[in-house]
A protein has these predicted regions:
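Acetyl-CoA-dependent GNAT
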Residues: 10-13, 21-96, 107-109, 113, ...
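Conserved N-terminal entry element of GNAT/NAT acetyltransferase domains
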Residues: 1-17, 162
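Hydrophobic residues in beta-strands and at strand termini
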Residues: 93, 126, 159-161
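Active-site beta-strand termini and strand-to-loop segments that position acidic
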Residues: 66-68, 159-162
């Protein structure tokens, strides 16, 4: 797969609004493929929780993929680390750019950066959309659960690597 070129930089506070819009767009445009309308609304609503979304982005090592030339945001990926273990907290691609390898490349760069800082293993809770990306990156499915989010139940998958 020929992954679109992108610039890669760390997220800063000024990015939160743009990333929330990308997150909301992904939920609203992709969510109906696998979720009920109520689940889609619940998923998208997190983008409106400014303090929560700000912590989601800035409380982890989040990086942004931008299109070269105009710096249009293409996606973002964040990981937190503790005691040598990394938890991938976010992996979102703008809907017009899904299925082009961008998510896999952002995940690869995120894991590589964390490994260079001493992280030896990774885990994540993922959705039906990102599960194939994580499996392709060498993660194994270890658990499937029904868990509440914004008042709705969602099926989520636990994946681990290393």
């Amino acid at each position: 797969m020929n992954v679109p070129a992108f610039e890669w930089r760390r997220a800063v506070p000024a990015d939160v609004f743009v990333l929330a819009a990308l997150y909301r767009d992904a939920a609203l445009r992709l969510g109906p493929l696998v979720y009920t309308p109520d689940q889609v609304r619940a998923w998208a609503s997190f983008a409106d929780d400014e303090p929560g979304f700000r912590a989601y982005v800035l409380g982890t090592d989040t990086w942004i993929a931008e299109r070269p030339g105009d710096a249009r945001t293409l996606g973002f990926c964040g990981v937190s680390t503790r005691d040598g273990l990394g938890e991938v907290r976010s992996l979102y691609v703008t809907p017009p750019r899904t299925r082009q390898g961008l998510g896999g490349e952002m995940l690869r760069r995120t894991l590589e950066r964390a490994e260079s800082d001493g992280t030896i293993g990774f885990a994540a809770w993922v959705t039906p959309f990102s599960l194939p990306v994580f499996l392709a990156a060498g993660f194994a499915l270890t658990q499937t659960v029904e868990a509440p989010f914004a008042g709705m139940m969602f099926e989520r998958y636990r994946v681990e690597r290393g």
